Amino acid sequence: MLCRQNWSERCETELNNHIAREYSASLSYHMLASYFDRDDVGLTKLVDYYSKASLEEREHADQFMKYQTKRGGIVQMNNVNPVKISLESPDDIVNAFKLALNLEKTINNYLLKL
């Protein structure tokens, strides 16, 4: 590859894994927004909050994809899966925020390892 600039296969793989994590977080936040948008839940401020969080994670993934391409890597997204979410109790709001905090901590830890 002519435009590859000091970009090892390991860097490419690890960045692709991180891109997948960002998209997984985006999907998870999107699912939370969808849950709080249900007519039997109807917490519109949380819909807005999680919709913005979803967009933010998607934008992060896009930035990493551009960087990967710029360095001569090939973007491959494997294992893009949202976190399993089960919200059907009075503690839904607390559980949603715990999930969001855990997602942010996990992504931050992976970034620190990169």
Give names to the regions the model predicted.
Residues 14-17, 21, 42, 49:
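Residue preference for a single heptad-register face of alpha-helical coiled-coils
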Residues 18-21, 25, 32, 80-114:
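Acidic/histidine-rich alpha-helical segments that form the ligand environment
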Residues 35:
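Conserved helix-loop functional segments at active or binding sites
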